[in-house]
């Protein structure tokens, strides 16, 4: 049987039942209260006191609460943790209510619908997305930033493409149909880290024509309708600031999957997941929040339309050379507030008087911006100037109406300027005259009584009063005052005349405050009429800010304007990695050239670790991306094709949460490139195949090189430690060898960080191990082994060379390992042969026809054994390390496991 709760608790339970997945902030006087399970959970999450109250049932009801004036911070905390908060307000005056005060939920705050507070990052969008899958495996995606009013809409051809878009926008909340499969819901939560919500209404209302009236395709109409229904249902108001939905296709921009963006560190670094150290960090010379958000959007979606790119470059070049005008623009833009989000607050009815002052100050900069831009020597400035709308009438309204330094609250008065409204002026005169009368009264009473310390004061409990200290009480004429309050050291009195004047003053002040609030709300409604113009202005200012930012960084870092080739030529002279150069300094960084054309489509890069291969590959990709967003590039000269896609496989990071090893991740990322790349794409593959055995890895690497060369024709930079692959240059006509240079000086290796034509002759792996701090005796032993191997390689007896170095005493271990290697080769052979059978046959034919005797034989790790030389004297620690090293089975180790083993050995020797 249900407990007999009080009417107020029954009201709470009735409303809570409508929002079971949200915390219900239930307004009671000056507090938002929570009850039952909400109270218990909120007390834990917000670290506030859990108490209880009598709710009419058998047991006391758990309760906690927060003051209404500080509730926003608590709401943000819950939303940041992925919760929703339903805000339930009193919607009638408690003084006139009969029974329980009527209450309604006025807004449902969700992770994707934050409008203000610390949960919004200044230079990042805060997107809510809706996703609709269709039977033909296409997906409708609509997303909006409620704080700015932006709405975007697209149709995607595959789940992979959809995933890339979801990662690019970083949606905080994804809205889907309630009948979605549980497995799909779980994947959305885990892979994209977004809160999941549900909405089933997918019909477009007539009043949404300004947002979606131009959307004609049914799939897109269904998708955007789901978004709008969810927004209206949760926000419970008209969303007048939502802009017309921008329809786009991903094919209109350079495509990069999330892995490529992460490998290239476009907006965040691999290690810290932070902005510092990324390309965005380098380029962000914007001085407005709007410009910062737009720059990230440009970087996420580089252009592929050459005319659009050249228009941006023209503007950047003009600003780059117009030094004084650019600095004038930067100074003016610094005084522009976030107009986009100010407009959102105005539309929501959340804007206070300080917001309107910020809007006025921002608009006051527009005439100067127009004048400066108009003076630039560029024909295209007229279009931008036309969008820089100064909204003079609005500035005049705000200048006449709003105080320069108004209070934060809009219900405490002192917002509206004198002279704006006659009624308000009359109330203010009455209040001011009354206060002048009070001052005169105080002076008169001091003179009559002779009490110099007598004063007239005020508090909200007793109103106005006359205060006299106790030593002066005998000086008061009999019957002059009426005693009101006794204090420790004084008495307070009133008079009939004082109370009469008090009533007039307080009435004037009360009516003045009420009228100011009404006037402010009316002014805010007038400002709403300017929302479309303000949004157009905000976009123009954001674009101007991004262009000046690109011009600033291009000027300060000595970048050059890229040229574009229709002949698929890539010619970079003196190219630099923009971020590495900034970190190291221009004097330290070593620039490199890169040349590719139709006859030179692939560069096979060899050379030692730490020599700069990966940096070289990344700088080529970053140069292309910077060029296609309309920025100058870090080089002495750059001619580039326009790339439709960029694919990368750089670095190794196990996806443990998905149960994927380094090698599986490597193969999946390689598959994306091989499946989707075109001859207009750019592919960067760094040491493909290192996550598996040597033969497997080399076979796959060679097969991939041949496949890209023969079937795709994309510009490709392929680095490898399989030096045997360099012989492919003779059989693949569009492949060229290049290498990262290194030299030895006095037995030490020096990495020159220069890329030169031809294959590398050595890997210098032992030198890298020495730099890592491995024991000297171990390093010397490795050098001896290497010398024997190189000598044996020259005599055609590699196995014998390794055997001589291994020694008799390890015979049993090595024989067992040799047997294991033989068995492994049988297993690998059948699999690898299937992968590369045709490629190997084709290569053999090429070699036969060319008379090429180059051998592709890989060094055997476990050859026949021979007598060992005399062992050098080793310490006990070194013997333990050597014994541990001999037990290592390299064939079954990933690179990460090998690195961990080296670390263990290093610790053992310390």
Swiss-Prot record:
**Keyword Ligase part of the UniProt annotation:** no
Which residues participate in ATP binding? 607-614
Q: Which InterPro entries match?
A: DNA_mismatch_repair_MutS, DNA_mismatch_repair_MutS-lik_N, DNA_mismatch_repair_MutS/MSH, DNA_mismatch_repair_MutS_C, DNA_mismatch_repair_MutS_clamp, DNA_mismatch_repair_MutS_core, DNA_mismatch_repair_MutS_N, DNA_mismatch_repair_MutS_sf
Instruction: State the Pfam families in the record.
Output: MutS_I, MutS_II, MutS_III, MutS_IV, MutS_V
Database matches in SMART domains: MUTSac, MUTSd
GO BP terms in the entry:
mismatch repair
* One GO cellular component, as annotated: cytosol
**From the UniProt record, which GO molecular function terms apply?**
ATP binding; ATP-dependent DNA damage sensor activity; damaged DNA binding; mismatched DNA binding
Q: Does the keyword Ion transport apply?
A: no
Database matches in PANTHER family: DNA MISMATCH REPAIR PROTEIN MSH1, MITOCHONDRIAL (PTHR11361:SF34), DNA MISMATCH REPAIR PROTEIN MUTS FAMILY MEMBER (PTHR11361)
> Its family?
Belongs to the DNA mismatch repair MutS family.
Q: What does this protein do?
A: This protein is involved in the repair of mismatches in DNA. It is possible that it carries out the mismatch recognition step. This protein has a weak ATPase activity.
Q: What is this protein called?
A: DNA mismatch repair protein MutS
Organism equals Geobacillus thermodenitrificans (strain NG80-2)
Q: Which gene encodes it?
A: mutS
């Amino acid at each position: 049987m249900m407990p007999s709760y009080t009417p107020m608790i029954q009201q709470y339970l009735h409303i809570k039942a409508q929002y079971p997945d949200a915390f219900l902030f239930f307004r009671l006087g000056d507090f938002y209260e929570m009850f039952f399970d909400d109270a218990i959970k909120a007390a834990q999450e917000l670290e506030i006191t859990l108490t209880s109250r009598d709710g009419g049932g058998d047991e006391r009801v758990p309760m906690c609460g927060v003051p209404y004036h500080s509730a926003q911070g608590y709401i943000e905390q819950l939303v940041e943790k992925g919760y929703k908060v339903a805000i339930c307000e009193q919607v009638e005056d408690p003084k006139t209510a009969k029974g329980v005060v009527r209450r309604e939920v006025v807004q449902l705050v969700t992770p994707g619908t934050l409008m203000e507070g610390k949960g919004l990052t200044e230079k990042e969008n805060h997107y809510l997305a809706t996703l609709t899958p269709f039977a033909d495996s296409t997906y409708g995606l609509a997303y909006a930033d409620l704080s700015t009013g932006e709405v975007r809409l697209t149709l995607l051809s595959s789940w992979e493409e959809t995933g890339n878009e979801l990662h690019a926008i970083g949606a905080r909340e994804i809205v889907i149909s309630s009948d979605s499969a549980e497995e799909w819901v779980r994947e959305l939560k885990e892979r994209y880290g977004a809160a999941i919500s549900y909405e089933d209404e997918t019909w477009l209302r007539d009043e949404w024509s300004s947002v979606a009236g131009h959307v004609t395709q049914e799939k897109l109409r269904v998708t955007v309708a789901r978004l709008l229904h969810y927004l209206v249902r949760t926000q419970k108001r008209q969303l007048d600031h939502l802009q017309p939905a921008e329809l786009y296709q991903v094919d209109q921009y350079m495509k990069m999957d999330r892995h490529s963006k992460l490998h290239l560190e476009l907006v965040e670094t691999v290690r810290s997941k932070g902005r510092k150290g990324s390309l965005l960090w380098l380029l962000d010379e914007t001085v407005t929040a709007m410009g910062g958000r737009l720059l990230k959007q440009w970087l996420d979606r580089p252009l592929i339309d050459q005319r659009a790119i050249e228009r941006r470059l023209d503007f950047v070049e003009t600003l780059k050379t117009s030094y004084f005008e650019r600095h004038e623009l930067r100074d003016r833009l610094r005084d522009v507030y976030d107009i986009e989000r100010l407009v959102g607050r105005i539309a929501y009815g959340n804007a206070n008087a300080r917001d309107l002052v910020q809007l006025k100050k921002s608009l006051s900069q527009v005439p100067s911006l127009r004048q400066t831009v108009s003076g630039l020597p560029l024909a295209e400035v007229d279009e931008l100037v036309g969008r820089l709308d100064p909204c003079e009438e609005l500035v005049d309204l705000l200048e006449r109406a709003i105080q320069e330094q108004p209070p934060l609250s809009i219900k405490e008065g002192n917002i509206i300027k004198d002279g704006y409204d006659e009624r308000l002026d009359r109330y203010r005169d009455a209040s001011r005259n009354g206060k002048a009368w009070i001052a005169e009264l105080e002076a008169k009473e001091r003179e009559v009584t002779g009490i110099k310390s007598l004063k007239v004061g005020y508090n909200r409990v007793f109103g106005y009063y006359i205060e006299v200290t106790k030593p002066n009480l005998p000086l008061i004429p009999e019957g002059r005052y009426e005693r009101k309050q006794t204090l420790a050291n004084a008495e307070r009195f009133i008079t009939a005349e004082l109370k009469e004047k008090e009533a007039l003053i307080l009435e004037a002040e009360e009516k003045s405050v009420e009228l100011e609030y009404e006037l402010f709300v009316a002014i805010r409604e007038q400002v709403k009429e300017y929302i479309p113009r303000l949004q157009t202005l905000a976009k123009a200012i954001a674009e101007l800010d991004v262009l000046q930012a690109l011009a600033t960084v291009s000027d300060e870092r000595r970048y050059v304007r890229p040229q574009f080739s229709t002949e698929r030529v890539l010619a970079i002279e003196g190219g630099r990695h923009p971020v590495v150069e900034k970190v190291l300094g221009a004097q330290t960084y070593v620039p490199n050239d890169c040349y590719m054309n139709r006859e030179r489509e692939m560069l096979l890069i060899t050379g030692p670790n730490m020599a700069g291969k990966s940096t070289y590959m990344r700088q080529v990709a970053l140069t292309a991306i910077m060029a296609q967003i309309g920025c100058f590039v870090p080089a002495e000269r750059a001619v580039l094709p326009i790339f439709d896609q960029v694919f990368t496989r750089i670095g190794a990071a196990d996806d443990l949460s998905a149960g994927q090893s380094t090698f599986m991740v490597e193969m999946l990322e390689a598959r994306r490139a091989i499946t989707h790349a075109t001859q207009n794409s750019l592919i960067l593959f760094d040491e493909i195949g290192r996550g598996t055995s040597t033969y497997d890895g080399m076979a796959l690497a060679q097969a991939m090189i041949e496949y890209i060369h023969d079937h795709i024709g994309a510009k490709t930079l392929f680095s490898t430690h399989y030096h045997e692959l360099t012989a492919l240059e003779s059989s693949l006509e569009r492949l060229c060898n290049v290498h990262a240079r290194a030299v030895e000086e006095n037995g030490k290796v020096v990495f020159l960080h220069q890329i030169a034509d031809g294959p590398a002759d050595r890997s210098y792996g032992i030198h890298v191990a020495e730099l890592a701090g491995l024991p000297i005796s171990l390093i010397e032993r490795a050098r001896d082994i290497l010398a024997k191997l190189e000598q044996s390689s020259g005599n055609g007896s590699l196995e014998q060379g390794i055997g001589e170095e291994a020694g008799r005493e390890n015979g049993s271990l090595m024989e067992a390992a040799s047997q294991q290697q033989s068995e492994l080769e049988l297993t690998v052979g059948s699999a690898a042969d299937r992968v590369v059978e045709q490629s190997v046959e084709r290569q053999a034919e090429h070699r036969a026809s060319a008379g090429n005797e180059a051998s592709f034989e890989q060094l055997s790790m476990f050859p026949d054994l021979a007598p060992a030389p005399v062992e050098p004297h080793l310490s006990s620690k070194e013997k333990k390390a050597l014994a541990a090293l001999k037990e290592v089975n390299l064939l079954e180790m990933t690179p990460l496991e090998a690195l961990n083993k080296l670390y263990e050995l290093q610790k053992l020797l310390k």
